[in-house]
Amino acid sequence: MTIVEGMGANSVHSPASRPVEVRGTLVLALLGAWTIVVPYLAVPLGFEVKVASLVEVVDHVVPGAFVVTAGLYLTRLARRRSLAGAQSALLAGGVCFLAGFWVLSTHEPLLADAARSANVSWAAAIWHFSTALPVVVLSLWFVLRSSAADPAP
């Protein structure tokens, strides 16, 4: 048996063998961090939305923390093995998807408010909504990727 034949799903590979997965997981973790800081950078940038600070924690900090944690876990996993067929990657990707969907769904009314009134500017609405779609799309890619069969023999 050669070294290549012995490489299974749990083999340790260099990050260079799966650069797209590793980079994608790092981007996901960075998007989670960005989700956390969005409402706090909104104030100096003039994109503030008048809501209670608890609302910002629930709508940004909590889901962002889930995405950062799961994204870093996925990064660690992707550096060790392919995410294809990894049940823990499916779970982590699902957590990120749900967190991103939470941000998406809680900010849809903000976009609707910006469309129908002058209470909220479009810039503020888009700023607060900015991480939702990228997190949902990227985490869905990881869910689909991890639910695929492992290509290794």
Placement of each model-derived feature along the sequence:
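C-terminal halves and exits of single transmembrane alpha-helices
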Residues: 93-115
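Transmembrane alpha-helix entry/boundary detector in multi-pass membrane proteins
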Residues: 20-24, 45-67, 89, 120-131
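Cytoplasmic membrane-interface segments at the C-terminal ends of transmembrane helices
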Residues: 13-21, 71-91, 137-153
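Alpha-helical membrane-associated segments of multi-pass integral membrane proteins
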Residues: 24, 115-150
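Membrane-helix interface motif
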Residues: 34-47, 105-113
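Short, structured motif recognition centered on aromatic/hydrophobic residues
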Residues: 27-37, 97-104
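Cytosolic juxtamembrane helix and N-cap/initiation of the first transmembrane helix
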Residues: 2-31
